[in-house]
Amino acid sequence: MSYAADVKKELTGLRVHDGNAKAELSALMRMNGVSTLGIDQTVSVKTENAAIARRIYTLLKQNYTQIEVEVTVAEHNYMSQHKSYGVLLKNKVSDVLTDLGVDPFGLHPDIPDRILNQVDKRRSFLRGAFLAAGSVNSPEKANYHLEIFTTHEELAETLRLMMAEFGLPAKIIDRSGGYVIYIKRAEKIVDFLSTIGATQTMLRFEDIRMMRDMRNSVNRMTNAELANIQKTADAANKQVQQILFIANEIGDLDLLPKKLRDIAKARLEHPDDSLAELGDRLEISKSGANHRMRKLKALEDMINAGVTYDLNKL
């Protein structure tokens, strides 16, 4: 089961009172409901999630009396294991939709104030919208992403504003004949899941994200340390080669001034030391050790260039 499916499974197990249940149903009906007009008017809510189908059925039966509701199941084809579910409301369709603030003709997209006039109702509406057409990437993946899809531009903007009320800065893009409201920042995805009541899967998201970020941080630190070690080793090896070259050219390192002689011999004796470590051995600073090495490098350059030099003036 995917992470998104786990989130929806948790949401379908939440208990809600009547006002919040109707706000959730309103979103589900708006986003996934299909009305059939005529004498035998019906409305069917489609989903590929059995738990969501049961949720819709239960909320309808709990909030409306004397309604006829049935759940239908359809297989995509005989080779497929995927099924789709429909929750079919067979009577009192107009009464139920009116109570939920849903226009069966889709001519009035506005949501009545009574559906969203409390904070918990707005949370429930967002929950219904996510159950109907939402998805979220697993926190194991590199790209954090949560989205809700709708074919109605007005509803997309309503959802965006509703999310902003909860401190969730969502964006909207056009996609395949509809609109996607999405969040990319991991901490805001966590906040969204908390807002709609997915507490357990939210905590799981946070745990996985923190472990993943920690591993990445450790890897970055390790890579940086390895790079520094390699850089130090390369520099030390180059200095050893310079000192050996100078010793061969002048005949004896003892001919060097004391400060340069000390650093040269220390480097040959401790080829793996960093400049800071060499400085500690000679009781000088890292910058002092670096200054002396630069003088040895200058001497090497003069020898290579055939320039006359005076060891006593180095």
UniProtKB/Swiss-Prot annotation:
Keywords: Cell cycle, Cell division, DNA-binding. Belongs to the WhiA family. Residues 274-305 bind DNA. InterPro entries: Homing_endonucl, Intein_endonuc_central, Sporu_reg_WhiA_N_dom, Sporulation_regulator_WhiA, Sporulation_regulator_WhiA_C, WhiA_LAGLIDADG_dom. It comes from the Bacteria. This is Probable cell division protein WhiA. Involved in cell division and chromosome segregation. One of its GO terms (biological process) is cell division. GO terms for molecular function: DNA binding; endonuclease activity. The lineage of its organism: Bacteria, Bacillati, Bacillota, Bacilli, Lactobacillales.
